[in-house]
């Protein structure tokens, strides 16, 4: 069995690279990312855990505008430390003229988020789960690890033969 240990990077194809770079460069800095690398028509940022890249779409790709409910990318959520960070992100977005589609608020029980658009209209989110969600996620992960470990033990393998 192969186990994914995390998502390494995400690359968004953008319609106007320079316009998107002007949007993403200060946003990524605000979110604690540093520049990983920049090439012609491509730029990436890293925060030690995640790599986030933008790349210029080719001419054919520019003809197909992003629409949230099409097959493929729906939205990307940046998990933040706390509700205050979500509120700070909204203030940053407002100060920088970003389009906020759903303002900071509790969208589900114990789930606080702000939703906004990039220059191509791609939906992004800054969010924070509350303590109840974190504890439930930790319990689910522990159960999965225990079940996986049990399948790998010699006595468990004998039962499956």
PLM feature spans:
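Short, hinge-like loop/turn segments at secondary-structure boundaries
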Residues: 54-55, 120
């Amino acid at each position: 069995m192969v186990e994914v240990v995390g998502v390494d990077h995400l690359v968004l194809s953008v319609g106007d690279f320079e316009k998107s770079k002007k949007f993403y460069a200060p946003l990524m800095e605000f979110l604690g990312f540093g520049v990983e690398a920049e090439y012609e028509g491509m730029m990436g940022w890293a925060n030690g855990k995640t790599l986030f890249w933008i790349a210029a779409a080719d001419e054919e790709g520019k003809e197909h505008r992003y629409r949230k409910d099409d097959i493929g990318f729906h939205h990307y959520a940046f998990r933040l430390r706390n509700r205050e960070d979500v509120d700070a992100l909204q203030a940053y977005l407002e100060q920088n003229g970003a389009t906020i589609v759903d303002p900071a608020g509790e969208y589900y029980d114990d789930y606080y988020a702000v939703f906004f658009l990039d220059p191509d209209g791609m939906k992004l989110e800054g969010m924070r789960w509350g303590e109840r969600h974190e504890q439930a996620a930790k319990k689910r992960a522990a159960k999965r690890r225990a079940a996986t470990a049990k399948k790998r033990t010699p006595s468990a393998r004998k039962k499956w033969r």
